[in-house]
A protein has these predicted regions:
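Active-site-adjacent segment of FAD-dependent monooxygenases/related oxidoreductases
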Residues: 3-81, 88-90, 99, 175, ...
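Short strand-connecting beta-turns/loops that link adjacent beta-strands
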Residues: 38, 70, 101-103, 115, ...
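Conserved mid-domain beta->alpha element of the FAD-binding
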Residues: 74, 128, 235, 242-264
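Conserved FAD-binding catalytic core of PHBH/FMO-like flavoproteins
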Residues: 76, 125, 129-244
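A conserved short coil-to-beta-strand element within the FAD-binding core of flavoproteins
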Residues: 89-106, 241
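Flavin (primarily FAD) cofactor-binding/catalytic cores of flavoenzymes
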Residues: 91, 110-115
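Short, hydrophobic/aromatic-rich segments at coil-to-beta transitions
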Residues: 103-108, 166-168
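Core beta-strand elements of the Rossmann-like FAD/NAD(P) dinucleotide-binding domain
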Residues: 114-125, 129
Length: 264
């Protein structure tokens, strides 16, 4: 994710990366809240403005910086370390078995994405950070339960002109009928990320929602923002994703653990 909590910035300080990070990032100092106007329900009005990070929580700010940049920072730290550690690319998880009596109980089979050759790795532990369709989670016998229907969001990083007063603040906006928006300014002082509520997704409408264009998502955003608007000059990146209300029935085994989106 592109949002980095202040306590996570503290962790980056241990790697000597915090100052570089906060010099480049957008600082989320305040958050504003907008709701439907009580007298004109089709319009929105500001209803609140709060400090984003409570006093005394951290010496560092909550910041926004592109995930690829964080990746670059960490790769640079690894390259300068004593071991000159480097990640392996072009491998995908194939299978996992556990022999509880062995010194290295975990045996993981990896498949090369080019050519399909298999590699075997033996270890004491394995941590699966392989996303919502986690192969590690399945291999340690864990399953997901919860609501099969997800909630869809359109997300755009845009260069745009807007008369919305809080365009350069993190803003949570709820309209009476058109849905919701979360605005998060990006680093650099020009781009803004726009999260647009696209509603509940099920088997009947999933294809239609996933097929929405960026122009249609922008139209929805403008309906939410009324009486304000955005005029998008350039969209540098956009996507549609779903958030499901699910949770795994367990996070770990004797020698295996799932983490992050692999648990949801």
């Amino acid at each position: 994710a592109d949002g980095i909590a202040c306590r996570t910035v503290e962790t980056f300080e241990a790697f000597g990366l915090a100052q570089t990070l906060i010099d480049e990032a957008y600082w989320v100092n305040e958050t504003t809240f907008w709701r439907p106007d009580a007298e004109h329900r089709g319009d929105i009005v500001r209803t609140g403005r709060v400090q984003d990070v409570e006093d005394g929580l951290s010496e560092f700010p909550h910041v926004i910086v592109n995930q690829a940049r964080i990746h670059d920072y960490l790769l640079g730290f690894m390259a300068r370390s004593r071991t000159r550690l480097a990640p392996d690319y072009g491998l995908e998880f194939d299978s996992l078995t556990v022999d509880r009596e062995a010194e290295y109980p975990v045996t993981v089979t990896l498949r090369e994405t080019e050519g399909g050759a298999l590699r075997t790795v033996r270890a004491r532990y394995v941590v699966g950070c392989d996303g919502a369709r986690s192969g590690v989670r399945k291999s340690i016998g864990r399953t997901l339960s919860g609501d099969a229907a997800g909630h869809a969001w359109g997300v755009l990083d845009v260069l745009a002109v807007s008369d919305f007063p809080d365009w350069r603040f993190k803003s949570a906006i709820q309209s009476s009928e058109a849905g919701s928006i979360l605005l998060i300014p990006r680093e650099g002082g020009n781009l803004v990320r726009v999260y647009v509520d696209l509603g509940t997704v099920d088997d009947e409408n999933r294809t239609r929602v996933r097929g929405l264009s960026r122009e249609e998502i922008t139209e929805t955003a403008n309906r939410v923002l009324h009486p304000y608007s955005i005029d998008v000059k350039e969209t540098v990146w956009w996507s549609i994703y779903e958030v499901a209300q699910r949770l795994t029935d367990g996070f770990d085994d004797v020698a295996g653990r799932s983490a992050g989106d692999a648990n949801a």
